[in-house]
């Protein structure tokens, strides 16, 4: 069952990424589906997206959630499963977290070089 869930996760991730590219084009904003976690009963799935630049993430996520019903409807027609999971969107903040860690490490490195 786990392998099936993994395949469903990957399928939803690919289809969602494709639909984002087709229906959600914003200038100077990059949206990436980083992972999908589908429940074992296939009734719901959490999709995590990263948005760059991060400063526009909340606003962009809000806009994306507004068109999610349309994207869900399209997914219902393109994915061949008995049940198409209902997608919930979440902001994946891990890339921003990593970026902050790198900035802090760079500051420490710079301060050590100055002393």
Language model regions located:
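Charge-rich, low-complexity N-terminal segments
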Residues: 1-44, 50-115
């Amino acid at each position: 069952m786990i392998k099936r869930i993994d395949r469903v996760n990957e399928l939803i991730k690919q289809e969602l990424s494709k639909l984002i590219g087709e229906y959600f084009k914003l200038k100077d904003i990059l949206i990436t589906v980083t992972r999908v976690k589908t429940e074992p009963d296939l009734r719901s799935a959490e999709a995590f997206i990263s948005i760059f630049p991060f400063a526009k993430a909340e606003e962009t996520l809000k806009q994306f959630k507004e068109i999610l019903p349309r994207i869900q409807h399209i997914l219902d027609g393109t994915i061949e499963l008995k049940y198409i999971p209902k997608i919930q969107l979440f902001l994946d903040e891990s890339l921003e977290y990593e970026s902050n860690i790198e900035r802090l490490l760079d500051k420490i490195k710079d301060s050590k070089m100055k002393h």
